[in-house]
């Protein structure tokens, strides 16, 4: 069964390009693992405007085992951890993580 991780971020005003740059860095081959997501998609509000509200990152995995393997890779990679570490100057703030399974 497919697993969908929905990661919600608040992006600071005027910092969306910085956040997109960070996501592009996350796609670098140094972060490729034996198990990779099936798809990665980024959404934002359309109404009342694109710079209002949260940004949603949707990452789809083949199953819970694939999600677990990828999560273990990310948690064990110090460079990945540094890239997404919370700090005051980061363009984004993590709001929530939801993990959904298809049925």
Give residue spans per PLM region.
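Active-site-flanking beta-strand signature of metal-NTP-handling nucleotidyl enzymes
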Residues: 2-10, 56
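A structural feature that tracks compact, well-ordered secondary-structure segments
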Residues: 7-10, 26, 45
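Short, surface-exposed ligand-recognition loops at beta-strand->loop->(often short) alpha-helix junctions
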Residues: 10-23
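Short coil/turn motifs at secondary-structure junctions
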Residues: 12-14, 62-64, 102
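An amphipathic, aromatic/His-enriched active-site/gating alpha helix that lines ligand/cofactor pockets
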Residues: 24-40, 48-51, 60-97
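Short, low-complexity Ser/Thr-rich regulatory SLiMs
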Residues: 44-46, 101
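A beta-strand edge to alpha-helix "cap/lid" segment located at domain peripheries
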Residues: 69, 102-103
């Amino acid at each position: 069964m497919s697993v969908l991780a929905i990661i919600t971020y608040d992006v600071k005003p005027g910092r969306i390009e910085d956040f997109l740059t960070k996501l592009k860095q996350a796609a670098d081959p140094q972060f490729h693992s034996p198990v990779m997501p099936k798809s990665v998609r980024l959404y934002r509000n359309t109404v009342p405007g694109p710079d209002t509200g949260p940004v949603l990152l949707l990452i789809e995995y083949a199953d819970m085992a694939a999600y677990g393997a990828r999560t273990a890779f990310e948690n064990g990679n110090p460079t990945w951890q540094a890239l997404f570490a919370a700090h005051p100057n980061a363009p984004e703030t993590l709001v929530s993580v939801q993990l959904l399974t298809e049925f």
